[in-house]
Amino acid sequence: MNLTGKKVILHDMSLRDGMHARQHQISLKEMVDVATGLDAAGVPLIEVTHGDGLGGASLNYGFPAHTDEEYLSAVIPKMKQAKVSALLLPGIGTGDHLRMAHDLGVNTIRVATHCTEADVSGQHISLSRELGLDTVGFLMMAHMVSPDKLLEQAKLMESYGANCIYCTDSAGYMLPGDVTSHIERLRGELKSDTQIGFHGHHNMGMSIANSLAAIQAGAERIDGSVAGLGAGAGNTPLEVFVAVLERMQVSHGINLYDIMDVAEDLVTPMMDQPIRIDRDALTLGYAGVYSSFLLFAQRAEKKHGIPARDILLELGRRGTVGGQEDMIDDTAMNMARERA
């Protein structure tokens, strides 16, 4: 693989996807400390919201330590070069949430849907573009569809006004060949000025290999998370990925030592538990289950006595997707009854 001379935009997820690993309890001080560290290290884009995006605070997804408005208001004024993004899932986040983010200075809105449901994103993508925001269509659980189907959905988002489309491996299920086929299909058929992005999870240990495959296939934006802080076994560990890109002579604009220090000195100490590929996280990737289901399944194990990996395998068999968190406890309860 020769990526010499390629240029990528790296996007940190530690303060949004990392919310899942922290049960949405990141403090304002932690948020600001990490964000300013990332900014100083040269990270160009930093995502800040509830783990499930703007408006995600709920009984179903979890109540955060602070509101999205409080987090964004604390971080954005401190940024010297980095831009701040926010995730929005139609049905959770609203137009009012989007306007609030714009008014606070958010640069990028990423409108996320399941990989077959791009048609629900039209209003939010259109509004984001009307407000002059960098607007991303974020197609989750991309492993569940063929490259042709992903392209069909991507074209819908592009038609609504998205200037960047993401292939999102929410389960950490994809292998490099899968990433290549999906990204190549997008790059070959979308408008030449529509950027392509890739978001990986490390549940099968493939996030760096998959991200490299994405770059080779034409992706220009790559998500990562400092120290891997994110749902499941975490996202592509950003400091490790930067080191790999350095060796492969890919331009990224981040200071390696500085990003290593943010990971070691700021992010790792605030973890509730080590971000690693344990048996439950591995099961997420193996079964193709949404990564943020991990802690829900572990809580269901304690409540019903069914091993989390058994619950996750059953959820994978049923084809559950993000937004069906309420099914996790029901599934565990039914499995417990059947085994009684």
Swiss-Prot record:
It comes from the Bacteria. GO terms for molecular function: 2-isopropylmalate synthase activity; 4-hydroxy-2-oxovalerate aldolase activity; manganese ion binding. The keyword Nucleus does not apply. Mn(2+) binds at residues 17, 199, 201. One of its GO terms (biological process) is L-leucine biosynthetic process. Belongs to the 4-hydroxy-2-oxovalerate aldolase family. This is 4-hydroxy-2-oxovalerate aldolase.
